[in-house]
Amino acid sequence: MNCLCCGKPLRTPDETGWHKACIKRFFGTTKLPEIEIDDKTLNLLATETTNKGFTVPGVQKKLSLHLVSDSRKPRLTLVNYPTGYILKPQVAEFEALPESEQLIMTMADMAGISTVPHALIKGNAGLAYITKRVDRNLTSDKVEMLAMEDFCQLDLRLTEDKYSCLLYTSPSPR
């Protein structure tokens, strides 16, 4: 089996599917964090928060998660802010979507394109895609939001037209 973070072979059979060095680099902990919610709840919350606009924009279901870094049992949870990770679970509409996103991001890394830290993580219903948030600077007293670019900007689309590309419609006149 290969590491779900770096893709290199694991030296020993490991339940987490991650190298210890990858866990430390990605999460800053010595143990792989557990996801505190079951997959049914995860999918329900991801759908609700995406539809209500309470999460990172996009058409794919996703959740913003906070790392509670208890040294004995680190966990990713919905409570507490600031959020430091984005989790994208499996979806019924598209088979292996998290694995596909991980593949594309790994290919971008290999091509020398700068990407956010990304990996796969095990859940009850299979693998989920996880990425570190890089659109915020976190300090002890505030959260500074940073401007970020995305692939829709390559098509010269305005923010309000971001999702019309998924419907194969024309962008708004400029």
Describe the residue ranges of each PLM region.
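Regulatory N- and C-terminal appendages and interdomain linkers associated
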Residues: 1-32
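A short mid-domain helix/strand-loop element embedded in enzyme catalytic domains
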Residues: 158-167
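N-terminal charged segments
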Residues: 30-49, 55-56
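Short, compositionally biased low-complexity segments
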Residues: 5-7, 14, 36, 74-82
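Conserved ATP-binding subdomain of kinase catalytic cores across diverse folds
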Residues: 48-159
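Short low-complexity stretches enriched in small and charged residues
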Residues: 14-23, 38-47, 84-89
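A diffuse structural propensity rather than consistent per-protein peaks
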Residues: 38, 147, 165-166
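Conserved small/polar residues in nucleotide/adenosyl-binding loops
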Residues: 168-174
